[in-house]
Amino acid sequence: MGILIFSMIGVAEIAFAVFSIITKSNQQKLRNISRIAAFTGFVVFAILPIIDWSSRYYALAVLLLLLAIIGAIALIRKKEEKKAYKSARVVLKAIGMTVLIFTLTLPAIIFPQHKAMEMTGEYKVATITRTYTDTKRVETYTDTGENRKLNVQLWYPEKADKRYPLIVFSHGGFGTKSSNESLYNELASQGYVVCSIDHTYQCLYTKGEDGRTTRIDMGYMQDVSAENALADRQKSYEYYQKWMKIRTGDIDFVIDHILSEAEKNNVDTAYKLVDTSKIGVMGHSLGGSAALGIGRMRKDVSGVIALESPFMCDIEGVKDGEFVFKEDIYPVPVLNVYSDSSWSNLDQWPQYAENYDLLSGTNATAFNVHMSGAGHFTLTDLALASPLLTRIFNGKKSTTGTEYCLKTINKICLEFFDSYLKGKGEFTADGMY
């Protein structure tokens, strides 16, 4: 829609410029009428609604409103043209307005309108957002001495009357708690309570119940961008230790907090629905690495899903220039989902050595799925929200459809958790999709 709006207004600007040059007139009256018509058309599009009214259109709407007001005032006053016609001025004005319109439609171009994916479960889904304070940990990204605070969001079956398994999700390196919302909704509609965490200072931004917004720590962002296991194993190991300590601490605390709330009276409905004996964890990228770590840390976790994530928590050190991994068999059922971004590199990227080993026969209960034609960020809802950014971050265009990819992931994740958290059937998904 953003491209369509820009094209319509851009073509109109060029047409006015050409017409003005042909008639050797500024055509100010006609231009004023067109400004009013443009704003009126925009409002009609929003009401119908052809335009999904949201923040992506705010700046453009303000500009069109201002131009319409100026045009209306000029028409009412019947203001005559005072500036003499000059073709150069007409051309520069058209170029300037086109550039301005393009700039203001960029949010709609980068984040185009899209329909939310339909849920297939029997339950309608409700959601709440909460802020948790971990009184046992001090925030390490600031020097205020404050305890670490985490903003979380829970999705759960609405109007349900029994208890359901708990699934906790950890976002990727620069992600947010909404990174895989289509997956959370699907799981909740099928009878799960899903909690996604904003890892404060490790997420792009997060907003607490008090309205305070906290943005990503620039030092952390630089570290993630600089990390290169092929070039410096020791430095990467130090990064992994630091990141995983924070991430696993967050997940561990959130699980404990939810389990504690589930045992209380007079708490939010979401907590009352939690079956404290059935817990799964999952995550994307860095978040998946933390989820894999939690699978070893907690005895009450029954299944782990990692969306393209190395076993960072299993790296015990560096010896002779190579990572040293735990030798113990991974203790819980695990589903690893890969895209083209890593699939052909699993045997080459040192941090993925344990992942590569799990592709062959092992004693661990491990499943491996390759989403062929997809990239790293196609495994998240960013692929729906911004195909352009997804293509840029992936480094190439995905050759598989976004909805097909996400629906397949949702289906496989549901089947995995149904099997290992609800005891429904045998999970067999494996291989390429």
Describe the role of every protein-language-model region:
Residues K29-R77:
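Membrane-embedded alpha-helical segments of integral membrane proteins
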Residues F39-G41, F45, A108-R163:
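N-terminal cap/lid segment of alpha/beta-hydrolase-fold proteins
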Residues Y58-L60, K86-V90, A116, Y356-Y433:
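C-terminal catalytic-base region of ester-bond hydrolases, centering on the histidine
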Residues Y85-P112:
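Internal/C-terminal transmembrane anchor helices
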Residues K162-G172, L183-E186, V194:
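Short beta-strand element of the alpha/beta-hydrolase
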Residues G208-T276:
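Alpha/beta-hydrolase active-site loop
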Residues V254-E322, D328-I329:
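Primarily recognizes the serine-hydrolase "nucleophile elbow" in alpha/beta-hydrolase
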Residues S302-H376:
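The feature captures the conserved acid-bearing segment of alpha/beta-hydrolase catalytic domains
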